[in-house]
């Protein structure tokens, strides 16, 4: 066991997570169509503060993230402060770590708490795949800049004459890695082939995710952590996530064609997480500040770790790299965990990480560790389903996982929970949570 790194303030306070909330998650182009991420962020933070009954002036910092950023609101965190009635003097800044963005936001607020610069803060993230920054071609962009500087109409017309019809076509946001040109699904296909993960295994995991998420909603387990969203024109509220397929069968999954490697692939739209709109946030405080306010924490942040690997091959192995580091810093092993919640970007990615967490060879030859991190106990793993079912608004997923895991730990009488995710750029994130 390596060095344990206690997450405490200078006064010995633990980092308490006192509350968490999210919007329902909606598939791209459905319930939240036309609602930008900044409005989703305002929606969830405003409701979180109202439900917690914590005076707005108590919150000293807000760290929020957005992956698909809109040019008109580059600092989503500050816009949320200004749009929710929070104290205008509240420190607010934005972060981005791809699919681990709200993990980063939580870590940043925790670090401010440990440094003693604040005693309470909000962390979270929001993304919209329905309101996108549709751009223009590089040639058109250059001409528009030059036209703005031109002094005469003839100069402007001469500049516009350089353009062709193809230069006027809108340019959608990139879906591939900037460094490699690979799409996430291409990497998932790599991983399926590298680790021998079959189409049947992927479909089975996806089906499990949807069944468990549907059961969680049916049992009322999510009602305290998901707000009702009232969407213009306010005729019909969104109460639950609208991606979950509770009545599907394995035979339904088998009907879909591969989405990335059309000829030999196994990754489909059904065994991948969909493009999604939504927002989520958590309130963090020092343990003593929570006691002063008479608040009972949902739980505590025990440790966290971020890692990075090469992006050319199997880059979605973040959980296999970050989990052993987070456990080491918490002074725990896999067997100490009550729950394990892993982000399901793709079923192939999830199954590959599970495989490597239990691999002695991977531990020795790749991580340089003496032993495997540990086998993943299926009875502890994604017990309420995962991102394949709920959806994945990139910057919101981490906060969803944290809140969901802490509530489930309480239902089980407390214990330790691991939340972990892969992210674009070969990044990984893991956090160990504790509930009493």
Swiss-Prot record:
Keywords: Acyltransferase, Cytoplasm, Fatty acid metabolism, Lipid degradation, Lipid metabolism, Transferase. CDD domains: thiolase. One of its GO terms (molecular function) is acetyl-CoA C-acyltransferase activity. It catalyses: an acyl-CoA + acetyl-CoA = a 3-oxoacyl-CoA + CoA. It is an enzyme of class 2 (transferase). Pathway: Lipid metabolism; fatty acid beta-oxidation. GO terms for cellular component: cytosol. The active site is at residues 99, 392, 422. It is found in: Cytoplasm. Its main location: cytoplasm. One of its GO terms (biological process) is fatty acid beta-oxidation. Pfam families: Thiolase_C (PF02803), Thiolase_N (PF00108). Its EC number is 2.3.1.16. Catalyzes the final step of fatty acid oxidation in which acetyl-CoA is released and the CoA ester of a fatty acid two carbons shorter is formed. Heterotetramer of two alpha chains (FadJ) and two beta chains (FadI). Belongs to the thiolase-like superfamily. Thiolase family. This is 3-ketoacyl-CoA thiolase. It comes from Escherichia coli (strain 55989 / EAEC). The gene is fadI.
